[in-house]
UniProtKB/Swiss-Prot annotation:
Disruption phenotype: No visible phenotype under normal growth conditions, but mutant plants show increased tolerance to paraquat. It comes from the Eukaryota. Residues 1-38 are annotated as: Disordered. It comes from Arabidopsis thaliana (Mouse-ear cress). GO terms for biological process: cadaverine transport; polyamine transport; response to heat. Its main location: membrane. Pfam families: AA_permease_2. This is Polyamine transporter RMV1. Residues 1-21 have a biased composition (Polar residues). It is a multi-pass membrane protein. Cell membrane polyamine/proton symporter involved in the polyamine uptake in cells. Possesses high affinity for spermine and spermidine and lower affinity for putrescine. Transports paraquat, a polyamine analog, and thus confers sensitivity to this chemical which is used as a herbicide. Keywords: Cell membrane, Membrane, Symport, Transmembrane, Transmembrane helix, Transport. It is found in: Cell membrane.
C-alpha cells in the first residue's frame, strides 16, 4: 500500500479546499500531515510536549482493532471445514480488507482528526448522516468490545473452571473491564506500548506451533469441505470471516494522535494487513493439517488443545495465556478508538462538549466511561449473538463509508490527498462493489432476531440526533465546535 502513495494534489485553484475554507490558524489539524497534537491542552502540557503514536505502536493497535491473532476463528472450520476456512482467509482480504484499508488510508490522511469516518460522512452527506455513522460505529465497537471479556474467560475456564459461570464469572468480567479501562485512561502512548508487547507474546506460540507441526502435516486434510451431514453453515462461516477481517477504519478515529499521519497511517495499515492475514492462515493450516479433523471441537479455545497435541502441555498453556493477553490488547485498542471517536464528535459539535474533555493524561475520560458502561451492559450476551449484531450494524456504517468515498472523489476531485488510491471515479465505484455485495450476502444470512435488534438500534440513532439538536436549542447541554478544526461546510 505504501507504493500507491501519490504526491499532494494542488487544490489551490479549487473553491472548496477540504483541509480548510477559512484562513488557517497555526493549530494542527488544519493542514494534512501536521504532527502536533490537539491545541486544547492545559498550560502545563503544551501541544509540542504530547507524545504522538509512531508506526510500530500503530501497527499493533490496528492489529488488535482488526484481529488480535487467530483466537475466535475456530468457528470458521466448525462451520465449513478446513478447505473453505483456508480459502476464506486468503480470498476474503481481497474482497473486503484491502479495499477498506485503502479507503481508510486515503480518507484518514485527508482528515487527520479524531472524528475519523464521522468527519468523512459529514462532509459528503451532511451532519445528520455523519451522526448516524458515528452512532452505529460507536455502538458496533462497544458491542465488539463486549466480546473480549467473554473470550478471555472462555480461554481460562479450562484451567480455572470456576470462571465458567455464575458469580465468579460476572465478577471476573467486571474486574477485567475496570482494570483495562483504567489503562486506557492512563494514556494512548501506554496503550500503544502495551499493544506491541501483548502482540509479540500472542503471536509467538503460533510461530512455534507452526514449526513443530511440520513433521505431522498431511496436506490432504486441507481439502475437506465439511463432514457434517447438514453441510456448510454459511451464516456462521461468513460472520466469523467478516468479524475477524473488518474494522480497518477504526484507526481513523485515532489519526489526530498519530505522528505524521500522511506517512505513518498508510504504512501501518500495510504492515498490519500482512500481520493479520498471516496470523490466521498459518494456525488454520497447522491445526487442520497436523491433527485429524473433528469439526465439532473447533470452537473458541480449541487452539490451546491443538497446541497440547502438537507441542505438549507447555505449548497449550502458552496459547491459553496468549489468548488471554490478546483479548486484553483488543479491548484496549477498541476502547481507545471508541472513546476518541466520541471526543472527535464532540469537537465537531455533534455531542455535548463534555465528551471533548481530556484527562491530565490527554485521554477522553468521559468517552472511556461511556464505552466501558456499554461493554458491561452487553457482556451478558452470547458470543455468536454479539458477533451477528455487531456485524450488521457495522455493515450499515460501511455502506455510508463507501458512498462517502465515491461522493468525495466526485465532489472534490482535486482536493489534497497525501495518500491517494490510483483509480478515478469509475475505479472507486468498481472497488466498492465487491465489499458492498458481500454486505448484502451477510445481511441475507442474518436471522430475524438479530436483524430486528440491529434495526431498533439504527432507529434509535435516527431519532437521537434530532433530540440532541433540541437539547442544544433549549440550552440544556452545551455544544460547541472546536476552533482549531477546519470548516467542513461550503
Amino acid at each position: 500500500m505504501t507504493e500507491l502513495s501519490s504526491p499532494n494534489l494542488d487544490s489551490a485553484s479549487q473553491k472548496p479546499r477540504i483541509s480548510t475554507e477559512n484562513p488557517p490558524p497555526p493549530p494542527p489539524h488544519i493542514s494534512i500531515g501536521v504532527t502536533t497534537g490537539d491545541p486544547a491542552t492545559s498550560p502545563a502540557r503544551t501541544v509540542n510536549q504530547i507524545k504522538k503514536i509512531t508506526v510500530l505502536p500503530l501497527v499493533f493497535l490496528i492489529f488488535y482493532e482488526v484481529s488480535g491473532g487467530p483466537f475466535g476463528i475456530e468457528d470458521s472450520v466448525k462451520a465449513a471445514g478446513p478447505l473453505l476456512a483456508i480459502v476464506g482467509f486468503i480470498v476474503f482480504p481481497f474482497i473486503w480488507s484491502i479495499p477498506e484499508a485503502l479507503i481508510t488510508a486515503e480518507m484518514g490522511t485527508m482528515f487527520p482528526e479524531n472524528g475519523g469516518y464521522v468527519v468523512w460522512v459529514t462532509l459528503a452527506m451532511g451532519p445528520y448522516w455523519g451522526f448516524q455513522q458515528g452512532w452505529v460505529k460507536w455502538l458496533s465497537g462497544v458491542i465488539d468490545n463486549a466480546l473480549y471479556p467473554i473470550l478471555f474467560l472462555d480461554y481460562l475456564k479450562s484451567g480455572i473452571p470456576i470462571l465458567g459461570s455464575g458469580i465468579p464469572r460476572v465478577a471476573a468480567i467486571l474486574v477485567l473491564t475496570v482494570a483495562l479501562t483504567y489503562l486506557n485512561y492512563r494514556g494512548l502512548s501506554i496503550v500503544g506500548v502495551a499493544a506491541v508487547l501483548l502482540g509479540v507474546f500472542s503471536i509467538l506460540p503460533f510461530v512455534v506451533m507452526s514449526f513443530m507441526s511440520i513433521p505431522k502435516l498431511k496436506p490432504s486434510r486441507w481439502l475437506v469441505v465439511s463432514k457434517k451431514m447438514k453441510g456448510v453453515n454459511w451464516s456462521l462461516y461468513l460472520n466469523t470471516l467478516f468479524w475477524n477481517l473488518n474494522y480497518w477504519d477504526s484507526v481513523s478515529t485515532l489519526t489526530g494522535e498519530v505522528e505524521n499521519p500522511s506517512k505513518t497511517l498508510p504504512r501501518a495499515l500495510f504492515y498490519a494487513l500482512l500481520l493479520v492475514v498471516f496470523s490466521y492462515i498459518f494456525p488454520v493450516l497447522t491445526g487442520t493439517g497436523a491433527i485429524a479433523l473433528d469439526q465439532k471441537l473447533w470452537t473458541d479455545g480449541y487452539f490451546a488443545d491443538i497446541g497440547k497435541v502438537i507441542g505438549g502441555v507447555w505449548l497449550g498453556w502458552w496459547i491459553q495465556a496468549a489468548a488471554a493477553t490478546s483479548n486484553m490488547g483488543m479491548f484496549l485498542a477498541e476502547m481507545s478508538s471508541d472513546s476518541f471517536q466520541l471526543l472527535g464528535m464532540a469537537e465537531r459539535g455533534m455531542l455535548p462538549e463534555v465528551f471533548a474533555k481530556r484527562s491530565r493524561y490527554r485521554t477522553p475520560w468521559v468517552g472511556i466511561l461511556f464505552s466501558a458502561s456499554g461493554v458491561i451492559i452487553l457482556s451478558w450476551l452470547s458470543f455468536q449473538e454479539i458477533v451477528a449484531a455487531e456485524n450488521l450494524l457495522y455493515c450499515f456504517g460501511m455502506v455510508l463509508e463507501f458512498i462517502t468515498f465515491v461522493r468525495l472523489r466526485m465532489k472534490y476531485p482535486a482536493a489534497s490527498r497525501p495518500f491517494k488510491i490510483p483509480v478515478g471515479v469509475l475505479g472507486s465505484v468498481l472497488m466498492c462493489i465487491p465489499p458492498t455485495v458481500l454486505i448484502g450476502v451477510i445481511m441475507a444470512f442474518t436471522n430475524l432476531k438479530v436483524a430486528l435488534v440491529s434495526l431498533a438500534a439504527i432507529v434509535i440513532g435516527l431519532v437521537l440526533q434530532p433530540c440532541l439538536k433540541q437539547v442544544e436549542k433549549k440550552g440544556w447541554l452545551k455544544f460547541s465546535t472546536s476552533s482549531h478544526l477546519p470548516n467542513l461546510m461550503e
